[in-house]
């Protein structure tokens, strides 16, 4: 998500009005809690244009706390903007060069050039080992290849680096389901819904997992009403 030059100029003018006249002062203002709260209020209560700009601004200053709050709201349009902005912060967390390499790997994977994608992601991870999205994208490629154990390991690493990564929780849940680990699959999908509670595909996947777990426990003689861990 990119901010228009005109909008950035307006923000700089506002920063100047509140006394941030140096470049350092402007940047400090943009990353301040005051600015983030202001943009959050615009995101949840502004008109369509204001919401779009606010989402871009929150992505620009990497305001994950505000965006993680916004994706839980009841307003679908606000959630959609917040989710896009949040994922932008994750994809760009390691810098422009890393983002380009990540996009290249994703393009290769989309064309089913999976080994090429893995090779690119291996290099990226070696260079940027704390880049959570690189691990997550490699997990996705492993999943597409049916290499579920390796995908789970990469999802786990993603979550060490970014505990809020709902995509990693979702992916790990699906992989564990493929491995027959139904209880663990349910747990992972619940964790994803804690972060992204309105996501319908995850809700549907969890319902199916819980049905399978219910049948499994009934078959094994476990009380159907027992708590699903």
Put a short name on every predicted segment.
Residues 21-31, 49-61, 69-72, 80-92, ...:
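Structural detector for internal amphipathic alpha-helices that build alpha-solenoid repeat scaffolds
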Residues 48, 98, 132-133, 166-167, ...:
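Helix-start (N-cap) detector for alpha-helical repeat units in TPR-like alpha-solenoids
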Residues 191-229:
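Terminal, low-structured helical/coil segments at or just beyond the last alpha-helical repeat
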